[in-house]
Regions:
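Bacterial N-terminal signal peptides
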Residues: 7-16
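Boundary at the C-terminal end of the N-terminal hydrophobic targeting segment
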Residues: 19-25
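Alpha/propeptide regions of enzymes that mature by internal proteolysis
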Residues: 26-218
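Positively charged n-region of N-terminal signal peptides that target proteins for export
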Residues: 1-4
């Protein structure tokens, strides 16, 4: 089986969120709809939603009890959004967006840390995390050859946020996984508009798992 780089899982930890959670404008989102709604439909979503989780079988891990959702969204203010691309027999990929709080993340940066257990990965933004100890954008997960699309989408998202009119540098954080076994990864089907759509769809509450978003082709 091909090695899947999941460097993000052990690399970026949201330690706390700023108290301010004012809503901001979302100027760039309309661009996502230019691709058509059909591109974002997930015919496998119902399968993912019904699959039992490990704890449903009585298997327990760790010494701490999970939150009520047993998801990253148990942390107040965190939201997650997915875009899943399933087209024909060859496209099985997508995007997962993690937003640590609903305010202006560039202005209200979130403490973070980086540690590489296996450096065979393409985690964009890791060097500034090590240098400054924070993140200033949401976190995007996608396939290995679409990291650049993730960066482009996050830069657009950040520049268009209300209050960021003077921003000239953005440390976009994008993790990846290689879905080339099931997906036409060389086709680079994920575009910046898909990144923006995943950010727009991000919400608190239960999180779809499995073959959805960035996990579709893995």
């Amino acid at each position: 089986m091909k090695h899947f780089s999941l460097l993000f899982i052990v690399s970026v930890f949201i330690l706390s969120a700023p108290a301010s959670t004012q809503a901001q404008s979302h100027g760039p989102y309309d661009a996502a709809h230019n691709l058509g709604e059909s591109a974002f439909q997930n015919p496998l979503a119902s399968v993912s939603a019904k699959r039992p989780r490990m704890r449903d079988y009585g298997i327990r891990t760790g010494v701490m009890q999970p939150g009520p959702l047993n998801a990253i969204t148990d942390v107040k203010g965190v939201s997650v959004g997915h875009v899943t691309l399933v087209e024909g027999d060859s496209v099985r990929t997508g995007v997962t967006a993690i937003i640590p709080h609903p305010g202006n993340i560039f202005r209200e940066k979130v403490p973070a840390a980086f540690w590489a257990g296996n450096g065979f990965g393409k985690l964009a933004g890791s060097t500034q995390i090590k240098e400054l100890g924070n993140i200033e954008t949401p976190v995007i997960l996608t396939n290995t050859l679409s990291v650049s699309a993730g960066v482009e989408g996050l830069v657009t998202y950040t520049l268009e946020r209300s209050g960021n009119g003077d921003v000239q540098s953005v440390n976009a954080v994008v993790g990846e996984t290689n879905d080339g076994e099931l997906n036409d990864i060389r086709g680079r089907h994920v575009k910046a508009a898909h990144i923006l759509d995943a950010l727009k769809k991000a919400a608190p509450g239960p999180v779809a798992e499995g073959n959805v978003g960035a996990g579709t082709g893995t």
